[in-house]
Curated annotation (Swiss-Prot):
Pfam families: FeoB_C, FeoB_N, Gate. The keyword Transmembrane applies. This is Fe(2+) transporter FeoB. Probable transporter of a GTP-driven Fe(2+) uptake system. Seems to be required for optimal intracellular infection of macrophages, to be important for growth and/or survival in iron-restricted amoebae. It also plays a key role in extracellular growth under iron-limited conditions. The keyword Nucleotide-binding applies. Keywords: Cell inner membrane, Cell membrane, GTP-binding, Ion transport, Iron, Iron transport, Membrane, Nucleotide-binding, Transmembrane, Transmembrane helix, Transport. Residues 1-167 form the FeoB-type G domain. GTP 2 binds at residues 33-37. The lineage of its organism: Bacteria, Pseudomonadati, Pseudomonadota, Gammaproteobacteria, Legionellales. GTP binds at residues 118-121, 147-149.
Length: 751
């Protein structure tokens, strides 16, 4: 077996290459002692097994105790500590000179290295030609030109790993005699301490460049003190010598012609990064994403809903009736498992549309600019602009967004990002929005969704601002970001990335929604006295009693006593937000007897025909929905007979529904999010997030509902608005003074 490390600069296509090499044969875990994700994969080449470990993206192997993220520290330590046979160094052919800096450091390890020269097609498009044979000769290692996103050059790279045994010699750097003597002395001292010759050479260079995390602490500190006494700026001298050597190599192997794409990028950036137009363009892009997801994705939603309802709910119920199964079995299978499958599959088109648009923004190069644009606004409030990059990931799922905060250098910025990320509307929340938009906002539903996403962003910023003024005081670290050139992503790549994200989401949602629907169906079938009902909802069921008991707590935000399924949805949503849709769909169906199946009413082919017929019908209304959302009407004539119809009767109109959506947006994160907050921060931060999000959600929903209904009952509304305002101020005061101890404890834990 051959074990190879995959390393390269950020945004060099390393992850794309890792996926191309290993396909689905991947494992994800954590590096020992830290929470940084560790990805390994393998593939067979004939009968030879090759294992790949994907290291975090880094610009340099120098690991300093201050100003380095966990990702960078892991990469720097892994090249020393792990047992491996060779290194695959991924280089962006468009930025050869900058990427060879890391290559020069890797050569000093004395290990076999294969250079994967990626994005050759993009380089050619930009007028860059590279003589790979001459580059291979000058570096002294294999150089394989590849296009990872098109799987071009991958077989040649795989073959090179079979013959990767030649140890690489370091590049010869032009240093002064005095500087070279100091490095030789360092190397000899390390050898006398028991280090192998190759590691002694490598460590001496890292120490000279200011690395404080390698070797024995006491010994390396003494060497660093001696270095400071030499009055030689070895780190600067080494960096200058590296760039000088790299420039010589690049001059010999690279030719650059006129680059039309650079001119196009520069012209477009004048508009996209304009001082006054940048933020409006950013919000316009976000708005287009929700417009695309709700209208384009929503056009196919009825197809998935009707077809899966016909097959898994009505079909399974009809089949069990033919087998004379008991009513409780029919209820559990049809309205439990069947309704769970129906719920999971129904919101696939909306989620897929959003993932597709996100992938388009990311691969085109705009998303990096979005972080740059938002940085100025966030830094004005003392918040780190870098936080917005992980927070954008939160539009898909809050869990990876919080985990992505590991890439931030500052501990303060990392904790701020962890606490702000749960307010970003994840794709599971989008599924809930889509259901309510169909029931209550058939015209201009994308405007409703956009407002919710915007409120989530504003609440995240507000939370960060409060933390900056209390627990996490300090200055925001500067944003250093590489802005890639704009390019047109291939449809194949967009579909592949959308498919990968969608499969993960559906798998995660399905394995939660289906069991929850079965459990809810069981609780709804069991009466308080221990009997079994026929499967229809009744006021004596355990679920009904629990829901009715808790519902009065939510009365100020418009949830009335007969709308107890909405309360149960909030409770199950604490497990996972995608479960809310399954809960509402299951309970409202049983309350309204929508799930009752009879042999006389079941028409399989009629249901399938109606499902296919919904696609052209919805697409024909797409133009009016996009260009004239006010006059467009998507009201369904059969809405009153469906779950949507039951929902519209139970909620207090559009106002009550929007108040409910505000609570869903802001309240307690799901179990997975809470767990990762505890993992990335500590228990106190987790509980702070839970309490803060619940208070903010409740206060915001109540204030909105009471404000909207102010004319109906002005005195009652005024009391509730004042009460919520005072409660929020009280929590802020408690938060300010009680968090001081938490901040000190956390600071101590991280020193």
């Amino acid at each position: 077996m051959t074990h190879a490390l995959l390393i390269g600069n950020p945004n060099c296509g390393k992850t794309t290459l890792f996926n191309a090499l290993t396909n689905a044969n991947q494992r994800v875990g954590n590096w020992p002692g830290v929470t940084v994700e560790k990805k390994t994969g393998e593939f067979l080449l004939g009968e030879h097994l090759i294992e790949i470990t994907d290291l975090p993206g880094v610009y340099s192997l120098v690991a300093n105790a201050e100003g380095i993220s966990q990702d960078e520290q892991i990469a720097a330590q892994s090249v020393i500590d792990l047992e491996y046979d060779c290194i695959i160094n991924v280089i962006d052919a468009c930025h050869l000179e900058r990427h060879l800096y890391l290559t020069s450091q890797l050569f000093e390890l004395g290990k076999p290295v294969v250079v994967a020269l990626n994005m050759m097609d993009i380089a050619e498009h930009r007028g860059i030609s590279i003589d790979t044979e001459k580059l291979e000769s000058l570096l002294g290692c294999s150089v394989i030109p590849i296009q990872a996103h098109k799987n071009i050059g991958i077989p040649a790279l795989q073959q090179s790993l079979l013959h990767c045994s030649q140890k690489i010699k370091p590049l010869k750097l032009s240093l002064s005699v005095a500087a070279q003597q100091i490095l030789n002395d360092l190397e000899n001292q390390l050898i006398s301490k028991g280090y192998k010759n190759s590691f002694a050479y490598y460590f001496s260079r890292r120490l000279a460049e200011g690395d404080t995390l390698i070797g024995e602490k006491a010994f390396t500190e003494s060497l660093l003190i001696k270095l400071q006494e030499t009055e030689q700026n070895l780190d600067v001298l080494l960096a200058d010598a590296r760039y000088q050597k790299i420039h010589e190599i690049v001059t010999l192997v690279q030719k650059k012609h006129s680059d039309a794409s650079e001119h196009f990028t520069a012209k477009l950036d004048k508009l996209v990064l304009h001082r006054f137009l940048a933020l409006p363009i950013f919000f316009a892009m976000m708005y287009l994403m929700f417009l695309f997801a709700i209208n384009i994705g929503g056009a196919f939603q009825d197809f998935f809903d009707i077809s899966t309802e016909t097959i898994f709910v009505q079909g399974s119920g009809w089949l069990l009736q033919q087998l004379h199964a008991p009513n409780w079995v029919i209820a559990l299978v049809a309205n439990g498992v069947g309704k769970g499958i129906n719920t999971t599959i129904t919101f696939i088109p909306v989620i897929a549309a959003m993932f597709f648009f996100l992938s388009l923004l990311e691969t085109s190069g705009y998303m990096a600019r979005a972080a740059f644009v938002v940085d100025k606004a966030m830094r004005a409030m003392g918040l780190p602009g870098k936080s917005f990059v992980p927070m954008i990931v939160g539009f898909g799922c809050n869990v990876p967004a919080i985990m992505a905060a590991r890439t931030l250098d500052s501990e303060r910025d990392r904790l701020l990002t962890v606490m702000m990320s749960p307010f970003m509307s994840c794709s599971a929340r989008l599924a809930i929005y889509a259901v309510f938009v169909a029931a209550f906002f058939p015209s201009g539903g994308h405007n409703v969704v956009f407002s919710l996403y915007l409120i989530g962003i504003l609440m995240a910023v507000f939370t960060g601002y409060i933390l900056r003024k209390t627990t996490l005081k300090g200055h925001a670290s500067p944003l250093i970001l590489e802005l890639p050139a704009y390019h047109r992503p291939s449809l194949r790549r967009l579909l592949r990335e959308t498919s990968l994200r969608l499969r993960f989401f559906v798998y995660r949602a399905g394995k939660l929604i289906i069991p929850i629907c079965v459990i809810l169906g069981g609780l709804n079938a069991i009466t308080w006295g221990g009997g079994i009902s026929s499967g229809e909802a009744n006021t004596d069921s355990l679920l009904s009693i629990i829901g009715q008991w808790i519902t009065p707590l939510f009365a100020p935000m418009g949830i009335h006593q007969d709308n107890w399924p909405a309360t149960v949805g909030l409770l199950t949503g604490m497990l996972a937000k995608e479960v809310v849709v399954g809960t509402l769909n299951s309970l409202y169906a049983q309350v309204g007897h929508v799930g009752e199946i009879t042999a006389a009413h079941f028409d399989f082919w009629g249901g399938i025909k109606a499902a296919f017929g919904s696609i052209p019908a919805n697409l024909s209304e797409l133009g009016s929905a996009l260009w004239n959302p006010v006059s467009a009407s998507a009201a369904d004539s059969e809405l009153s007979q469906s779950v949507y119809g039951i929902m519209s009767r139970r909620f207090d109109g559009a106002v009550g529904a929007y108040a409910y959506l505000l609570f869903v947006l802001l309240y307690i994160p799901c179990v997975s999010t809470m767990a990762v907050i505890r993992q990335e921060a500590n228990k106190r931060f987790m509980w702070t997030s839970i309490v803060w999000s619940f208070v903010v959600a409740y206060a915001t929903s109540v204030v909105f509902y009471q404000g909207a209904k102010f004319l109906d009952h002005p005195q009652q509304s005024m009391v509730w608005i004042l009460a919520m305002s005072l409660s929020l101020l009280f929590v802020l005061a408690v938060f300010r003074y009680s968090q001081y101890g938490m901040g000190r404890q956390n600071a101590a834990a991280n020193t």
